[in-house]
Amino acid sequence: MSTNEGSLWGGRFADGPADALAALSKSTHFDWVLAPYDIAASKAHARVLFSAGLLTEDQRDGLLAGLDSLASDVADGSFAPLVTDEDVHGALERGLIDRVGAELGGRLRAGRSRNDQVATLFRAWLRDAIRRVADGVLGVVSALATQAAAHPTAIMPGKTHLQSAQPVLLAHHLLAHAHPLLRDVERLADFDKRAAVSPYGAGALAGSSLGLDPDAIAAELGFDSAADNSIDATAARDFAAEAAFVLAMIGVDLSRLAEDIILWSTTEFGYVTLHDAWSTGSSIMPQKKNPDIAELARGKSGRLIGNLTGLLATLKAQPLAYNRDLQEDKEPVFDSVAQLELLLPAVAGLVSTLRFDVDRMAELAPLGYTLATDVAEWLVRRGVPFRVAHEAAGAAVRAAEARGVGLEDLEDAELTGIHPELTGDVREVLTVEGSVNSRDARGGTAPVQVAKQLNVVRDTADRLRLALRR
């Protein structure tokens, strides 16, 4: 009789565990999401046991039928963990034994440990999860691309240090948020190559002596290969840390987009109006329309960063191989996935319904002497060294500021007084449209270049969607 009913160990113990230990050890409140993966792995394990001569055909078929019944009951909620179940593995073994009996159900545990089980299930769950997250990220990219396509010629103030710098196209700025998100999806796709290695068959750490075939289980579960080193297979969680990093990076990239939207929606900027369905009000101030989605995106990025750093701290000092510390590996990653699955559709909805005040942005685009660089580059095209041209353009700004006028309002004599090459012809470039159109090198803000960037974003998104469906 086991001293620890509902768990997968106990024969060596005469008593226990203490209630406080049982409560501390319990993980079914978070690892139950692995149940479908556990059952799929158990079915593959039954087939491998049969191939190794450790099960008869009838025993294999009986286990598979019991596992199918258990899977159905898990799916509809009629089977769930009990308070006495330590983890998802023990709960499901209990469920299987209830269906096929202790003699047959007990045979399935041969040749496997919770150590290789959980490492495999975590990888399998995470491979599916990152595809869902990637799809959500691509939804935000699609919203950004749609807005960019809808505003192909709208000009806005480009900023550095949050100070007006140079005029840029709104579409150019929006696509600048799309590119890092696409890189995040590329990271998720690349991550899958390292996650697609199955630890199954590694046992507790030393491998199996029962003639089992780890490659067969790996293939059945959709992995690319089995692990090369059984100790590493059970102990490694760098795949979890890598995923947590990419999830945190997505949070950071969303936070930067959110910060722009928060600023743009203020009265002081006035670039955008938020859609009623994607904003909230105040309990006391009737006039308020608050960018809550953007603010929550900004806040959740800190949570995702915390999940990453917490996981790394858990991993940093563990000796090989498996240690119980690794029970703490899943909740941070599960939470990061859950937060992004909640956040991404909301951000996509927010972005897709933004209403831009293009007249307001165009009005602000030249303010702050944002065409000063155009003056300097105009002089360079006339043979003036850039260092000298930069000084001359700065002097022109100083003169215009002193008079409270724009650069285009300086008199010809004032211009040539600053530099003999700085003639009234410079006014040809002192328009925001001329400034934007002139920046037509690859990646620049000229409409022809931004149209190419839009095509790149859409083509890359389509390619990544296909890659993630494989």
UniProtKB/Swiss-Prot annotation:
Q: What is the top-level taxon of the source organism?
A: Bacteria
Name of the molecule in the record: Argininosuccinate lyase
Keyword Cytoplasm found: yes
Query: Is Translocase given among the entry's keywords?
Result: no
Q: Which SUPFAM superfamilies match?
A: L-aspartase-like
In terms of InterPro entries, this protein maps to: Arg_succ_lyase_C (IPR029419), Argininosuccinate_lyase (IPR009049), Fumarase/histidase_N (IPR024083), Fumarate_lyase_CS (IPR020557), Fumarate_lyase_fam (IPR000362), Fumarate_lyase_N (IPR022761), L-Aspartase-like (IPR008948)
Q: Where in the cell is it found?
A: Cytoplasm
Q: Which reaction does it catalyse?
A: 2-(N(omega)-L-arginino)succinate = fumarate + L-arginine
Keywords carried by this UniProt record: Amino-acid biosynthesis, Arginine biosynthesis, Cytoplasm, Lyase
Mind telling me which GO cellular component terms the entry cites? cytosol
Which ranges of the sequence are coiled-coil? none
Q: Which Gene Ontology terms describe the biological processes this protein takes part in?
A: arginine biosynthetic process via ornithine; L-arginine biosynthetic process
Question: Which gene specifies this protein's sequence?
Answer: argH
| Family named by the database record | Belongs to the lyase 1 family. Argininosuccinate lyase subfamily.
Pfam families from the UniProt entry: ASL_C2, Lyase_1
